[in-house]
Amino acid sequence: MFISVLLILFALCVTLIPEAHYHMVRVWSFVATIIPMWVVTWMWWNFDASGHGLQMLVILGRSHLAFGIDGVALSLMLLTTVLFPICMMLLRTVAGFMTFILLEVLVLSALCVLDLLGFYILFEASLILLFLLIGRAPYGSLEAAYKIVLYTMAGSLVLLPTLFMIYSECGTTNVLYMTCAYNHQTVLGWGLLAVLAVKIPLMPVHLWLPEAHVAAPTAGSVLLAGVLLKLGGIGFLRFMLPVVPEFCVSVFPLVSTLCLVSFLFSTLSTLRQIDLKKIVAYSSIAHMSMVTLAIFSQSEFSAYSSSFLMIAHGLISPALFLIVGILYDRAHTKFILYFSGLGASMPIGSTLFFLFTLGNLAFPLFPNFIAEVLCMVSIFAVHELLAYVFCVCQVLGAAYGFWAFNRVVHGLPRGPADVTRTEFHTVLPLLIGAVWLGIKPMA
């Protein structure tokens, strides 16, 4: 809560600076995203990892609006505060600075809010900024922006009346005090599943994500893959499993089928894409499908494995979008057919592309490897056949990853310049974080 207030104050300070002083606006905006990172680092240092349940609880008066963190939320908050300064280095407009500061306020608040209605409001408010970010980008698309709104609002219209019904029955929407009878669990469970399946996303409500990534600027794609998709995962872990546990057990066959179809379809779709951003976007759908299935398995390692995969994906996928953005700045295209021989003209960029491609394919020494192994263990505990099918589908993931890398890096060189110092520094923290988590996952 303190971080959100601090960011709002910084946003107000930035608005008082004349636009003519662009450099000062950029510096203050960057500082506005650095300070929350230090605050969250202090929270990490003082967090009791051996304890269970929520810590650092803050309850606002009689409204029962509560904020608190657990290990999953704190890890995602740390990831969020690392990604936002990187995005600030990519922005060039004052409106973009303000949009990203406000978006960080909404995301950090959503990660630590304990009220279902509050989560819903913050969740939907982030869509407004995402709509502006995608619809008004230099090469943005209003069609993609409207797609996001239509898909998400369809799920939200199911959840909102359900929340009012639950509030009339329980007198609160705070997860600390909510108790739902089984008949209410069914109604609330379907509402939550409808809205979170769009956000994470699962088939058949996934089509907005590739279009959004293609239309968004590089900074928008970094946040969408690294942070905003994780709101669906935190919604499942914090609100759905504790509030409607019996519904989650009864709906597991349906969810597991959706996850399997989403994983298989997104992987096969990736093999036929020619847009580099769509390749990374469809791979994100595959990873988040595995996250969802691990969560609903409710085995001993399900919470840890799913949250670890979200964090690993939040490091690897944004880095791939950064590299695609670097290639776009050189060639002004994202189509894979126009790239060739970058290994000769961009040795540093090609090396980074190779390393993060390995990370995306769950190669050892990267956190995706540990996370996906733990997810497989969680799935094996409840359904062995399903786990075997997921293991076989992983081979397709290796196929599209190496095909894209081979097409871009090898062949006759076409001469784009290598990465600049600033571009290298935007990717370097993600590489360090990914390798560190891959070597020391319990840190």
UniProtKB/Swiss-Prot annotation:
User: GO biological process annotations for this chain's record?
Assistant: ATP synthesis coupled electron transport
A single Gene Ontology MF term assigned here is:
NADH dehydrogenase (ubiquinone) activity
Q: What is its EC number?
A: 7.1.1.2
> InterPro entries from the xrefs?
NADH_Q_OxRdtase_chainM/4, NADH_UbQ_OxRdtase, ND/Mrp_TM
TM regions (residue ranges): 1-21, 27-47, 71-91, 93-113, 114-134, 148-168, 187-207, 217-237, 247-267, 279-299, 308-328, 335-355, 362-382, 385-405, 423-443
Q: Where in the cell is it found?
A: Mitochondrion membrane
User: What is the name listed in the Swiss-Prot or TrEMBL entry for this protein?
Assistant: NADH-ubiquinone oxidoreductase chain 4
* Provenance organism: Chlamydomonas reinhardtii
Q: How does it sit in the membrane?
A: Multi-pass membrane protein
Any idea which UniProt keywords this protein has?
Electron transport, Membrane, Mitochondrion, NAD, Respiratory chain, Translocase, Transmembrane, Transmembrane helix, Transport, Ubiquinone
- Catalytic activity from the UniProt record: a ubiquinone + NADH + 5 H(+)(in) = a ubiquinol + NAD(+) + 4 H(+)(out)
Q: Which GO terms describe its cellular component?
A: mitochondrial membrane
Query: Pfam families, from UniProt?
Result: Proton_antipo_M
- What protein family does this chain belong to? Belongs to the complex I subunit 4 family.
